[in-house]
Amino acid sequence: MLKMDREKLIVPNQIGYLILKEDGAVLESGGDLKNDERSANVIMGLLNLTETIDESFMPSSSCERITIDYEHHYYSICMSNRRIYIIKISKSQNGVTTTTSSSSSNSVYNDASDSGAVLA
């Protein structure tokens, strides 16, 4: 794990971040996601997929955040001011893995194992 500038720490236990333009171009990156254009492309594909969800499935609902959950870390993806923010967050605190619930209505995808993972 790389050390990041304190200014770029968006959340506690953050181990990486990407900031993208709406078209997927990487504006900034750091930590485990430093210069990770592959992950940026995968996430843009996921975001494009969410735009094709049938309105009758989720009427009058707008996705505010996507969480991709793994055993030891998770990704939180949101959009603000025409930028896409992707944060990789460790579930460990002082070497102890904590568990999180992903039953939130904002959670779109949950995969607890790394075996079929797209982002790892």
Swiss-Prot record:
GO terms for biological process: cellular response to amino acid stimulus; positive regulation of TOR signaling; positive regulation of TORC1 signaling; protein localization to lysosome; regulation of cell size. Residues 97-107 have a biased composition (Low complexity). Residues 93-120 are annotated as: Disordered. InterPro entries: LAMTOR4. Keywords: Lysosome. It is found in: Lysosome. Its main location: other. It comes from the Eukaryota. The keyword Ion transport does not apply. GO terms for cellular component: lysosome; Ragulator complex. Belongs to the LAMTOR4 family. Regulator of the TOR pathway, a signaling cascade that promotes cell growth in response to growth factors, energy levels, and amino acids. As part of the Ragulator complex, may activate the TOR signaling cascade in response to amino acids. Part of the Ragulator complex composed of Lamtor3, Lamtor2, CG14184, CG14812, and Lamtor4. This is Ragulator complex protein LAMTOR4 homolog. It comes from Drosophila melanogaster (Fruit fly).
